[in-house]
Structure formats: structure tokens, C-alpha cells
Amino acid sequence: MPTAVQPDPPSADDAFYVGYDPPMPPPIARVVRRAVWLAVAIGVSAVALVAGRHRAIAGGVFEFGNVQPVTGVVVERPYPALRPRDGRPAVLLVATGKHGAAPLVRGLTDRAVSVRGQRISRDGNEMLEISSIGQNASPGDAPGGAPGAGVVLAVTLRGEIVDSKCFLGVMVPGQGKTHRACASLCLRGGIPPALFVEDRAGESRLVLLVSPAGEAMDPAIVADRAFEATEMAGSLSRADGWWVLRTDPATWRRLAN
């Protein structure tokens, strides 16, 4: 009669596990635990490395939903602004969305008003997205005339044409090629155009762009050049706390990005 052959007892290498049939055999459990801890360690290290190499995105502040009043005298040209009574720099005015405020302040030049809106600010430059305007004084009650412009300098500047609303804080980042389509629409809608310039020391300035006669720029012209590196010459002055460049678009020169 043949002798029955007894199978060898199972070893640790023979462990087999089906995911829906617990418990997990100890040898497999040990391997899984090690793999999980290794994955966690790699993940934490990757997050720390990415965070350490992250560069902060420059931008301003948009106080969305915080409607507050600002009083002052309306300036219609070249771009709508409010000159505060306390002598602080003028606050540029814009409408909601991608629209300038020219239709909202038409006929209110030198009128003292109270404007309710949402503040937009960056590096000391302020803007207000208008919610409502209430006239609270007659022309005769308004504060004195506009502060005189500072020294006029003949300059040649290099920088990028930006829409001031997004750049000052409505969008972060509000500059660069990824923002070009949005900026073009804002400029066509009447948002004041500006030139963002940086000097060799890394100091940056926002310069409002106006025509040689000191009037608002043609929206179509600046919209077509949104966020293009551009060289432009003109007369630079300081007015109402803002840098302003009178320049002829016909003399502008595109620069290689």
C-alpha cells in the first residue's frame, strides 16, 4: 500500500491574501506598512521641497464685498478719479466688470461727492470700483483746485502695458502673458492703461499712460499691446499722487520678450 506524502508546512513566503477576506497575513501586513510609511515620507518631502521653492505671486488687494464710502472731488479727465478732501493721492474710479467709469461721472467734474465702492490697492496706488455715487455739495462747496503736476521730465521707459484694475489687485497675478486676453478686454472697456516698469535695482513703478495732449489713450491701441514688452518715450510727471506719461503710440517700439 503506498505511503501518503504529507505536504510541507506553509512558510512565510507562502502567505496569500485576498483584499476582501481579512485579516491580512502578518508577512504581507509588514510589507504594506513599510510601503505606506515610505510613500508618506516621500509625499511629505515632496511637499516641503515644492513649498520651499515656491515664489510668492505679486499682487494687490481687492476688498471684494466690503463696500465703503469715500468722499472727494470728481476728476473726469484724463481718467475718472476722486480727489480726497484730505490731500491724499487721487483714487482712480472704475465701474464693475471690465468697464471704465467715464459714463458714471460724466458732468460731475469738480463736484464734491460721496462714492460707495470696493477698494482696490497696490503699492500705495488706490482705485475704487463704484457701487453708487451721491452728490453732496455744489461746485462752490468743493475743495480747491487740483494739486499742481510735479517736475516734467523727458524720459524713455521700458515695461509692459497693463490694465490698471486687474494689476492693482482684482486679479492675482494681474500681469503676464497668461493674463493678456483679460487685460485686452479691460482696456477696450475703458479701464485706465498703465505701464509697469522696473529699474535695475528691482524697484517698480506704475505709470498711467495718456496722449501727448494729456487726454485718455485710444482703448483699441493699448488693448492690442496688452502685456507686450514696449519701449516708449514721452514726458513724465507726477500728478495727484500718480506717475503720468504723455506719449505718442506711434513712437512705441516692441521689445523682444
Where are these regions (language model features)?
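OB-fold and OB-like single-stranded nucleic-acid-recognition modules
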Residues: 2-257
